[in-house]
């Protein structure tokens, strides 16, 4: 495989910088500082130190014996990003970008958020580093994720509701970029996934690759070999790139799981790679959901973190060369996996992560007991319990058996 991105920020045909002239200089400044930071041993040491002593890394690799026994196929392992401080992988990237912002002398952070986990992570690091933070969030996601909205405000962030479009992640990102254009002198835009113009997809990958770096070392120590299959959910795709990147040169099957919503052949899904076509969104060439006139088709998923109409350009590239296989899982399949993991292992996953669990369960059942499947459990499901209660028809105070 060729080394990507190239000097123009391209991953094959994908990526690049499709932005207004006013953002070219800020992006060039970020790229220059990022390259210097990644080559600076003291920066890397400070990043690792904060991850260890503030976020709680390394996160464990957990064997799932009950799930394995019930499926009767491959051995199931979980990379526990749900055990990070703030409850998801998003903190890895937020710490890295906050350190870079601090290095650049920026005092204010801008973030967009869907499920709320990146917003919480941004608000958390802003509090930790003594910065201001403004988070843009779609009104629909605010309703779905009211606990995370309260957390952000509790941490001192300003949460700006976005009422345009479908009122979800795409629209929050649009507003965050507009705000950054007008305030780029003293604000740092902290993108939460491997999306956007160069150098953001590369930067977020570098701050998330610790997931796969740790998992590789842990798996070798545990099994004496690499996993046969690795599965991760894909919205923008940062947890998946973080997990996949260290394994790209290895003989390991990599499977990304998109949201099929109410069905891959209905209008209600967010399966960008499976159903999308090439186009530009949020400053990068990638696959996206669009109509014949190039207008964005609104995505749908039960998961606020997966209903994005684009995908990280590196994922688009990996799909185009066939290195990663991208499949999809419906709302109902994800909900079933959410309950399955909770009831077999006592682990409540984020509904985003449950999409990966669902696909891993399907794959494992056709594999032999001497084979292994590694799931990136990108976050915990506390934030989704109310959504699950509504979805399953259970009311507060009703017997828990009602949701079995």
Curated annotation (Swiss-Prot):
Keywords: Amino-acid biosynthesis, Aromatic amino acid biosynthesis, Lyase, Pyridoxal phosphate, Tryptophan biosynthesis. One of its GO terms (molecular function) is tryptophan synthase activity. It is an enzyme of class 4 (lyase). Its EC number is 4.2.1.20. One of its GO terms (cellular component) is cytoplasm. It catalyses: (1S,2R)-1-C-(indol-3-yl)glycerol 3-phosphate + L-serine = D-glyceraldehyde 3-phosphate + L-tryptophan + H2O. Pathway: Amino-acid biosynthesis; L-tryptophan biosynthesis; L-tryptophan from chorismate: step 5/5. Its cofactor is pyridoxal 5'-phosphate. Pfam families: PALP. The modification N6-(pyridoxal phosphate)lysine is found at residue 90. The beta subunit is responsible for the synthesis of L-tryptophan from indole and L-serine. Belongs to the TrpB family. NCBIfam families: trpB. Tetramer of two alpha and two beta chains. This is Tryptophan synthase beta chain. It comes from Geobacillus stearothermophilus (Bacillus stearothermophilus).
């Amino acid at each position: 495989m060729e080394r990507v991105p190239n000097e123009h920020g391209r991953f094959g045909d994908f990526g690049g910088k499709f932005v207004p002239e006013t953002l070219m200089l800020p992006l060039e400044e970020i790229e220059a500082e990022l390259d210097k930071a990644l080559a600076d041993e003291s920066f890397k040491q400070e990043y690792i130190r904060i991850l260890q002593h503030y976020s709680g890394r390394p996160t464990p690799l957990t064997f799932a014996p009950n799930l394995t026994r019930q499926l009767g196929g491959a051995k199931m392992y979980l990379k526990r990003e749900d055990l990070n401080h703030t409850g998801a992988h998003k903190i890895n990237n937020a710490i890295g970008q906050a350190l870079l912002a601090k290095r650049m002398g920026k005092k204010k952070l801008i973030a967009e958020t869907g499920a709320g986990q990146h917003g919480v992570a941004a608000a958390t690091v802003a509090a930790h580093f003594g910065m201001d933070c403004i988070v843009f969030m779609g009104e629909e996601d605010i309703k779905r994720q009211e606990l995370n909205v309260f957390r952000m405000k509790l941490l001192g962030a300003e949460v700006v509701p976005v009422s345009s479009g479908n009122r979800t992640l795409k629209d929050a990102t649009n507003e965050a970029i507009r705000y950054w254009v007008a305030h780029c002198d003293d604000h740092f835009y902290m993108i939460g996934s491997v999306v956007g113009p160069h150098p953001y997809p590369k930067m977020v990958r570098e701050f998330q690759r610790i997931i796969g770096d740790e998992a590789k070392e842990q798996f070798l120590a545990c099994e004496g070999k690499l996993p046969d299959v690795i599965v991760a959910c894909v919205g923008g795709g940062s947890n998946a790139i973080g997990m996949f990147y260290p394994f790209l040169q290895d003989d390991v099957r990599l499977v990304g799981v998109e949201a099929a919503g109410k069905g891959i052949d209905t209008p209600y899904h967010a399966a960008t790679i499976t159903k999308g076509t090439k186009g530009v969104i949020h400053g990068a060439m990638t696959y996206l959901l669009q109509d014949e006139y190039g207008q964005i088709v609104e995505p749908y998923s039960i998961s606020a973190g997966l209903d994005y109409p684009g995908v990280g350009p590196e994922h688009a590239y990996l799909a185009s060369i066939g290195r990663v296989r991208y499949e999809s899982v419906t709302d109902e399949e994800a909900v079933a996996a959410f309950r399955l993991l909770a009831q077999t292992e006592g682990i409540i996953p984020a509904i985003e992560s449950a999409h990966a669990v669902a696909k891993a369960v399907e794959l494992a059942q056709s594999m032999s007991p001497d084979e292994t499947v590694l799931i990136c459990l990108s976050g915990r499901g506390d934030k989704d319990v109310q959504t699950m209660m509504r979805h399953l028809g259970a009311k507060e105070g009703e017997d828990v058996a009602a949701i079995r």
